[in-house]
Amino acid sequence: MRSTLECLTDWMSRQRWYAGKGRTPQLVEVSCVDWPSSDADARVQVMLVRDLASNPPSLYHVPVVLRQTIPRGSGATFIGRDENNDYLFDGAYEPAYTSALLHQLGLERENQRSRVHAGEQSNTSIIFDDGPEP
């Protein structure tokens, strides 16, 4: 099995927002914080990782949701499987993360619907709409 950083290394190099195009990331964990999750089947981690392959090094904020199983329809957001047999997913697309984000911001909303902005940009933006998740 691979470490979380090894999973992130493979995944990040394929992301449109990765600044080191053509280079293999050399990631170092700066911080990893567990956030409370209202989804009993999900752990939410917010990571800061520094990429030493860039000069100067780049810092990335990476929300990750860890699960014991792969939920139906979440294959596109799959990052990898770590040494603890957890399946890692891109938090931006995961209701467990977006709910935890709102909680951290002090914005308690039940079943808040969110989506990731689909336009081309160098980051990932989450848009919160009125109403519950579809």
Task: Give, region by region, the residue ranges found by the protein language model.
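Phosphate/pyrophosphate-binding loops and the adjoining catalytic core of nucleotide-dependent enzymes
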Residues: 1-130
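Conserved catalytic cores of phosphodiester-cleaving nucleases, focusing on short active-site segments
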Residues: 132-134
